[in-house]
Amino acid sequence: IDMDKYTLDAVLRKGAELVKRKGIKCLVIDPFNKVRDINGNESGDVNVYTLEYLSKIEIFAKKYDVLVIVVAHPTKMYKGTDGKIEEPTMYNIKGGGEWYDASYHGLLVHRDYEAQTVKAKVLKVKFQNLGENGAEAHFSWERRSGSFVPLADINNDDPMPWEDV
């Protein structure tokens, strides 16, 4: 494996090329810890490194008008007193304070292995007209179709949180 292809600068260069050649509107970096910023943070401070990393992504996103999604897994999560794995926050990602402060949005995807469900939860929305902090949706995995299915039926007549009632 040529690890030089997996640096942040190389991924952003390829992203810029794809914007120009294919007109992409979304770039996904998955997982964050495998796409290293080898030119950043000489001090070794993880918070400075994370801030520089996210700043490069923000500059790229604004320059090319592209949505950039960064998949960042939390550090090891432990079971709570109820025996379930605790729900992570943005602070559970290495460099966590910077993840919360520097990002525009934060979305949690968390599995409940016992109940065999998945929760999608909004952890941060910078602009309130784009969503609601703390909003949740719950899903189950449907093996036959290979997709997530909402646990509760959605009523299309219900107003969205940002719509005036």
Model regions and ranges:
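Walker B catalytic acidic pair
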Residues: D30-P31
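A generic secondary-structure micro-motif detector
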Residues: V46-N47, E86
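Conserved ATPase-coupling elements of RecA-like P-loop NTPase cores
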Residues: R36-D45
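Non-membrane alpha-helical structural segments and their capping/turn regions in soluble enzymes
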Residues: L8, N47-L51
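Conserved H-loop
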Residues: V66, V70-H73
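Signature of the SF2 helicase/ATPase Hel1-core->accessory helical subdomain module
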Residues: K34, T75-K76
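C-terminal regions of RecA-like/P-loop NTPase motor modules
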Residues: K5-L27, N41, S55-Y64, K76-V165
